């Protein structure tokens, strides 16, 4: 049975794609046939081949399995806003069945699937549903990316509690140092280790350029 994991963040812009790329590189190093999946993405760019999202392109490039863009990212919206508003602007509806069909397709081509979410855990994909509702439907184990900065402890602990309240397991978490000037970094990590369930999968040092990320950059 193919393993699938959902990767979320404590907020938007906390390094989900950095962590996804590192995990995919680690899988490649371990000879694990892992596919990356970014089912919903805003802030995409129109091209001759259709909408393209930079995060989804990074995930496509890092996947061990060779994938077409549409296999990686079925919903790509142009506006850099919440997916539910971006979809509404473009007259689209984000369908859970489409997300599930895409996941099952990737499972058939791989040994494991890493699914990167959009925004944080409770990001809305319509006026009535959240992306986390789909994760709950699929009963997926969750990996949390913590953007280490002032205030992240509360964000991380509240997110972990929400995941647990949804009946899902937080199997691991990654600390990403998004601000090189963050004071008391070591103390923050200790508090995360004490208060978050699941395994600390690694710490990502501050990296201004995503292209420099390889599996060696994260302690998996």
Swiss-Prot record:
Its EC number is 6.3.3.3. SUPFAM superfamilies: P-loop containing nucleoside triphosphate hydrolases. One of its GO terms (cellular component) is cytosol. Its main location: cytoplasm. It is an enzyme of class 6 (ligase). Keywords: ATP-binding, Biotin biosynthesis, Cytoplasm, Ligase, Magnesium, Metal-binding, Nucleotide-binding. It catalyses: (7R,8S)-7,8-diammoniononanoate + CO2 + ATP = (4R,5S)-dethiobiotin + ADP + phosphate + 3 H(+). The keyword Magnesium applies. InterPro entries: DTB_synth_BioD, P-loop_NTPase. The active site is at 38. ATP binds at residues 13-18, 55, 116-119, 176-177, 212. Pathway: Cofactor biosynthesis; biotin biosynthesis; biotin from 7,8-diaminononanoate: step 1/2. Substrate binds at residue 42. GO terms for biological process: biotin biosynthetic process. This is ATP-dependent dethiobiotin synthetase BioD. It comes from Photobacterium profundum (strain SS9).
């Amino acid at each position: 049975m193919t393993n699938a994991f959902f990767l979320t963040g404590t907020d938007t812009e906390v390094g989900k794609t950095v962590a996804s790329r590192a995990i995919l590189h680690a899988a490649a190093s371990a000879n694990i046939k892992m596919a990356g999946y970014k089912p919903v993405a805003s802030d995409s760019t129109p091209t001759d081949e259709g909408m393209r999202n930079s995060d989804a392109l990074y995930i496509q490039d890092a996947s061990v399995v060779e994938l077409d863009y549409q296999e990686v990212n079925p919903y790509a919206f142009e506006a850099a806003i919440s997916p539910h508003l971006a979809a509404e602007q473009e007259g689209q509806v984000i369908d859970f069945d489409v997300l599930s069909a895409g996941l099952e397709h990737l499972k058939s081509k791989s040994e494991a699937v890493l699914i990167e979410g959009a925004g944080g855990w409770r990001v809305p994909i319509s006026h009535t549903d959240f992306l986390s509702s789909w994760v709950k439907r699929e009963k997926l184990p969750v990996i949390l990316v913590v953007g280490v900065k002032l205030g992240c402890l509360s964000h991380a602990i509240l997110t972990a509690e929400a995941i647990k309240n949804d009946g899902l397991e937080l199997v691991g978490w990654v600390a990403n140092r998004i601000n090189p000037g963050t004071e008391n970094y070591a103390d923050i990590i200790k508090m995360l280790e004490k208060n978050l369930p699941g395994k600390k999968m690694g710490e990502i040092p501050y990296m201004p350029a995503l292209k420099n990320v390889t599996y060696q950059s994260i302690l998996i």
